[in-house]
Amino acid sequence: MSKGILKVLQPEGWAPAKGYANGIAARGEMIFVAGMIGWNSQCQFETDDFVAQCKQALQNIVATLACAGAGPEHMARMTWYVKDKKEYVSRGRELGKVYQEVMGKNYPAMTLVQVADLVEDRALVEIEVTAVKP
């Protein structure tokens, strides 16, 4: 499958990835978005809810991509750092809806890592993105 400058890499015979791509080939201008957490534009947390913080972090990514004239459709790689993988898994459906609401049906190569802690004490998730635009 190809979406312009991004080509999804799907090895022959593999089951389709659900909610992410196994790999992405990209060409164009690279954009690196630092790890975004679930606080607002004034660096204030409005919630301690995991899914709500994920939504805010995703919105922060979209806002940062827009500064480069890019959007979710340009994402090639996304890395999630979460404090509690069990909450991530148990709230997967809810999180999937929030993801599609903010990012649409754009699924980059994705990794999720559980970490012992994040720099900001109230942060429950941190997400970084690499994007490529023509």
Where in this protein do the model-derived segments appear?
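N-terminal presequence-like segments and the immediate start of the first folded domain
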Residues: M1-A76, V82-P134
